A protein has these predicted regions:
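N-terminal helix-turn-helix DNA-binding core of bacterial DNA-binding proteins
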Residues: 2-42
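Short beta-strand "wing" residues that participate in macromolecule-binding interfaces
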Residues: 58
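Basic, amphipathic "hinge/linker" alpha-helix immediately C-terminal to the N-terminal HTH DNA-binding motif
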Residues: 63, 67-85
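Glycine-centered, phosphate/nucleic-acid-interacting loop/turn motifs that mediate DNA/RNA or nucleotide
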Residues: 54
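Amphipathic alpha-helical dimerization/coiled-coil segments
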Residues: 82-108
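Short, hydrophobic-biased segments on the C-terminal half of alpha helices
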Residues: 47-49
Length: 108
């Protein structure tokens, strides 16, 4: 995609992905890469930040003889996701208004 993706948008996407289903880093990264060009080296610090903020919890589960770290949303994470959904809607509505020439200029 042409448009750069901020860390806040990545946080929003992570919360949305994990809220639908507990997931692990590689799977989260694979899903986000469908809309944003990110590297795992970018993703993991954001996952850690969300965990430290209390938005995500982790647990380990064995998969093919190895332990895999899964992420799950907390109640606080669900609240943050709801907030970010609202902010995203406002943001995209304003962009759409500008693109379509419907945004009123307050300084006129």
């Amino acid at each position: 995609m042409y448009f750069p993706t901020s860390a806040t948008v990545i946080e929003f996407l992570i919360l949305a992905i994990v809220d639908k289903e507990d997931s692990y880093g590689y799977a989260i990264s694979h899903t986000i890469k469908k809309v944003a060009n990110i590297k795992e080296s970018t993703l993991y610090p954001i996952l850690k930040k969300l965990e430290k903020a209390g938005y995500l919890n982790t647990y380990q589960q064995e998969y093919q003889g190895r332990k895999r770290k899964y992420y799950t949303t907390t109640e606080r994470g669900k609240q943050q996701l709801t907030f970010l959904k609202g902010e995203w809607q406002l943001y995209t509505n304003k962009i759409e208004e500008i693109v379509e020439g419907r945004l009123e200029d307050d300084e006129k």
